[in-house]
Amino acid sequence: NRKRKYPMTKQFDVIIIGGGATGAGVARDCSLRGIRALLLERGDIATGATGRNHGLLHSGARYAVTDRESAEECIKENMILRRIASHCVEQTDGLFLSLPEDGLEFQAKFVEACRAAGIRADVIDPKEALRLEPSANPAMIGAVRVPDGAVDPFRLTAANVIDAKAHGAEVLTYHEVLDFLREQNRITGVKVLDRKTGQTAEYRAQVVVNAGGIWGHDIARKAGVTVNMLPAKGSLLI
């Protein structure tokens, strides 16, 4: 009900700013632990970077050779999502191909690095790779199958929000953080604008989480903190 009267202040354990994949996930995690959480989003859920991505659920294979730590983190989270949010994941798998000009020397190194990071990496015949993906380059001389997948970011974020609310979290969309509340050099809450009614309200918490994604530096600036971020756009050709 947008006509409700807001109290002057309302107390929570944690306030999360940003209703994308990260913010929704934090809200759910907190609520499952019995932490009273408030999620604030200036637009609608998943309208930022979360709603503008390729939806690839990385296995971590692409990082295995050069960044094992990231590869291990990817496969761990990959498996968690498949287990707890299978309705949001399409288990497509992924193919890493070797062309004649590449040779097969790197393939062995790649497979070894994947397996060392805990990532399934199956060397398959090029004919099998073409059966799995008919549009692949038929000139390939090698192929490795890894557990990449596709994730629906809208469904996943919405599912996290729904579950967070079911466990006691409060979620306010179209609520923009105007400023932070401070006491003795500590952030103690936020001042918020309801962008639909024009009303303002204050919410307090022991912890405030900045989950604003690429806009996080603007949020941090309101708290007097400089976070150096360089926004970058990319394109995908299919």
Each model region followed by its residue ranges:
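Core beta-strand elements of the Rossmann-like FAD/NAD(P) dinucleotide-binding domain
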Residues: 10-12, 197-207
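Short hydrophobic core segments
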Residues: 17, 203-213
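Glycine-rich FAD pyrophosphate-binding loop
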Residues: 31-51
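Dinucleotide-binding Rossmann-like beta1-alpha1 core, especially the glycine-rich loop
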Residues: 55-128, 132
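Central beta-strand plus flanking loop segment that forms part of the substrate or channel wall
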Residues: 57, 224-238
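Flavin (FAD/FMN) cofactor-binding and adjacent substrate-gating region
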Residues: 97-167, 172-173, 179-186, 191, ...
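Flavin (primarily FAD) binding-site architecture
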Residues: 210-224
